[in-house]
Amino acid sequence: MIKQIFGKLPRKPSKSLQNDSNGEGGVNNSYYASNSSTTSISKPSSTSSKSSSASGSRVANGTLAPNSMSSNRNTNQGKKPLGGDAVVQAGPFPSSGGVYEALPSFRDVPISEKPNLFIGKLSMCCVVFDFSDPSKNLKEKEIKRQTLLELVDYVASVGFKFNDVSMQELTKMVAVNLFRTFPSANHESKILEIHDMDDEEPSLEPAWPHVQVVYEILLRFVASPMTDAKLAKRYIDHSFVLKLLDLFDSEDQREREYLKTILHRVYGKFMVHRPYIRKAINNIFYRFISETEKHNGIAELLEILGSIINGFALPLKEEHKLFLLRALIPLHKPKCSSVYHQQLSYCIVQFVEKDFKLADTVIRGLLKYWPVTNSSKEVMFLGELEEVLEATQAAEFQRCMVPLSRQIARCLNSSHFQVAERALFLWNNDHIRNLITQNHKVIMPIVFPALERNTRGHWNQAVQSLTINVRKVLCEIDQVLFDECLAKFQVEEVNKTEVKAKRERTWQRLEDLATSKTVVTNEAVLVPRFVSSVNLTTSSSESTGS
């Protein structure tokens, strides 16, 4: 009976081993601890069918089947698949007669027949249904879902090593159900904005009742001790990993969470793929920064990298330092950086904690991409700056303290009270206050004018109170230098007042000159905007003499 159901098994593939250099830098085990329990598989809900924007891309899933199935598809050309256009057949129906029916349960067959039944169920699940119409193929969809759930239990509890055929069929089934192209967005007219994201609901994957279970199967397979990495790398190869990375652009956060966990497991299990994974993530970042500024999975990719960076061996390789300089630091530039800033900040701080000499590079990078008109983004930059400074030693701080102090002074004088407050809070950090104290002769003259202007005229009372406290701290550090800075500030204020008065007198002369010329000639007079006071005086005397 079993032989009649299954028919012929696929041929054993030829071995094509791929050579790759061993990756360095392990994976932080704390990530596995927090993700050791897999996500529970929920029942199909009506919400999964609300968004059908991705359904069109899923219709092409059948084309992802390996070449071994091409002859089968060619024989069916011109014939309508079961259930009309709602079904994409990536392989032959596993049961005779072209009817999509459930195969026997694993509990109902002998142990010797379970491997064959496993292959049959995998082949059966290569049929992809269209979820854009939730009323079609309800019976077949439920049969496939129950079959997928059986495969989850089988993969999790299998008591022997997976062989070539099992790995080939499993990865083929995963590819058919998961790998797809997302609709391209109009990047020119729709740049990802955090404000827009608050108003718009993300598009959910319509086929999630099936897709979720397929992700669960892949996760159990990669994490299983019965999966031999040396054998599995022939099927979970560079192409497979790259297609997994492409799926991170999914709008469905549930899918990105599964991908994050699976890719982390792949990075930990397949050491041969580690350099390639890092390079592929780099390329995603480069394209995001330089071309699109639109990608849904940057935060998840950075979260994976945070754990990878934590496992880097010391001393850091030049490759890793270039990654920091060319990919991570420029990620502060896009307008939508607030979406992933928390994960980005964690990666940046990890690098500084690994190698304190990178602090100067990181701080100068932050100053390079410091926001000018986005106050909320500026507050986030100040928070990240504080975390970086906590890991910064005195020697590195001295290399960048002058431009850094100038930027902090600009933040202190910001009319946005949250920016000014966040800059003043830096003095509450003991380590940062010690760095300022050690270098107060350089820093105090730079920030003192900003503090004094806040004390005298900032519109926000809370900012004024915090400024007075910081002013007292500086006074306690060096009373003599404080008095010198105060005297210099007062002189500069007097000079500014005189310059302002002189400028007003200059404009008054211009107005008087224009008025007198108009009265005499009854014609408009064009006077250069920037005219020296000497020329103005000469012109006035000549006009008076005439």
Swiss-Prot record:
<dbReference type="GO" id="GO:0080183">
    <property type="term" value="P:response to photooxidative stress"/>
</dbReference>
<keyword id="KW-0346">Stress response</keyword>
<dbReference type="GO" id="GO:0005829">
    <property type="term" value="C:cytosol"/>
</dbReference>
<feature type="compositionally biased region" description="Low complexity">
    <location>
        <begin position="29"/>
        <end position="57"/>
    </location>
</feature>
<comment type="subunit">
    <text>PP2A consists of a common heteromeric enzyme, composed of a catalytic subunit (subunits C), a constant regulatory subunit (subunit A), and a variety of regulatory subunits such as subunits B (the R2/B/PR55/B55, R3/B''/PR72/PR130/PR59 and R5/B'/B56 families).</text>
</comment>
<dbReference type="InterPro" id="IPR016024">
    <property type="entry name" value="ARM-type_fold"/>
</dbReference>
<keyword id="KW-0496">Mitochondrion</keyword>
<comment type="similarity">
    <text>Belongs to the phosphatase 2A regulatory subunit B56 family.</text>
</comment>
<dbReference type="Pfam" id="PF01603">
    <property type="entry name" value="B56"/>
</dbReference>
<dbReference type="GO" id="GO:1900458">
    <property type="term" value="P:negative regulation of brassinosteroid mediated signaling pathway"/>
</dbReference>
<keyword id="KW-0963">Cytoplasm</keyword>
<dbReference type="InterPro" id="IPR011989">
    <property type="entry name" value="ARM-like"/>
</dbReference>
<keyword id="KW-0611">Plant defense</keyword>
<dbReference type="InterPro" id="IPR002554">
    <property type="entry name" value="PP2A_B56"/>
</dbReference>
<feature type="compositionally biased region" description="Polar residues">
    <location>
        <begin position="58"/>
        <end position="78"/>
    </location>
</feature>
<dbReference type="GO" id="GO:0000159">
    <property type="term" value="C:protein phosphatase type 2A complex"/>
</dbReference>
<comment type="function">
    <text>The B regulatory subunit may modulate substrate selectivity and catalytic activity, and may also direct the localization of the catalytic enzyme to a particular subcellular compartment. The holoenzyme composed of PP2AA1, PP2A4 and B'ZETA acts as negative regulator of plant innate immunity by controlling BAK1 phosphorylation state and activation in surface-localized immune receptor complexes. Required for the formation of the PP2A holoenzyme that negatively regulates brassinosteroid signaling by dephosphorylating and inactivating BRI1 in the cytoplasm.</text>
</comment>
<keyword id="KW-1070">Brassinosteroid signaling pathway</keyword>
<dbReference type="GO" id="GO:0006952">
    <property type="term" value="P:defense response"/>
</dbReference>
<dbReference type="GO" id="GO:0045824">
    <property type="term" value="P:negative regulation of innate immune response"/>
</dbReference>
<feature type="region of interest" description="Disordered">
    <location>
        <begin position="1"/>
        <end position="88"/>
    </location>
</feature>
<dbReference type="GO" id="GO:0005739">
    <property type="term" value="C:mitochondrion"/>
</dbReference>
<dbReference type="GO" id="GO:0009742">
    <property type="term" value="P:brassinosteroid mediated signaling pathway"/>
</dbReference>
<protein>
    <recommendedName>
        <fullName>Serine/threonine protein phosphatase 2A 59 kDa regulatory subunit B' zeta isoform</fullName>
    </recommendedName>
</protein>
<dbReference type="GO" id="GO:0019888">
    <property type="term" value="F:protein phosphatase regulator activity"/>
</dbReference>
